[in-house]
């Protein structure tokens, strides 16, 4: 069982002034931009720099949780300069835009994780239940260490 864990977070500033708010509609929901893309990319670069430094001799496997982390994982991969690999896992824990509390693996992990450094790449950690399940599942596959890299965290929702 893996005993090493770490967290890389893209921590975004909360006190940003927005001059123009873009809108996007997905299905029947309309969203307004709350964090400018340039700010997100700047913070992803900070995290990539840390991963480049901390993992330089590890050849980590980035395990991106689909669908949400796809763009974040792509941006992060472009900024990494160390040897690394990426793979994808798809879990279902939402019904529409609400977390169900139940996590179902839809697309599993095919890689051998024995003695590998694994970085789980997630877009949003809301309740933490998905991360808990992933760490438990990955830990049974004997990785050297497991780290979490999340774009956003909702601390008030963590369980």
PLM feature spans:
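PRPP-associated nucleotide enzymes
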Residues: 4-159
């Amino acid at each position: 069982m893996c005993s090493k864990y770490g967290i890389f977070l893209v921590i975004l500033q909360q006190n940003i002034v927005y001059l123009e708010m873009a809108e996007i509609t997905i299905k029947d929901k309309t969203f307004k931009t709350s964090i400018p893309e340039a700010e997100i990319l700047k913070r992803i670069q900070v995290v990539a720099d840390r991963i480049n430094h901390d993992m330089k001799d590890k050849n980590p496997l980035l395990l991106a949780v689909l669908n949400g982390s796809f763009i974040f994982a792509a941006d992060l991969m472009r900024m990494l300069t160390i040897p690394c690999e990426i793979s994808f896992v798809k879990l279902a824990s939402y019904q529409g835009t609400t977390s169900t509390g139940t996590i179902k693996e839809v697309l599993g992990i095919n890689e051998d994780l024995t003695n590998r450094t694994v970085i789980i790449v997630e877009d949003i950690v809301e309740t933490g239940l998905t991360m808990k399940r992933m760490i438990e599942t990955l830990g049974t596959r004997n990785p050297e260490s497991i780290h979490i890299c999340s774009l956003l965290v909702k601390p008030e929702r963590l369980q």
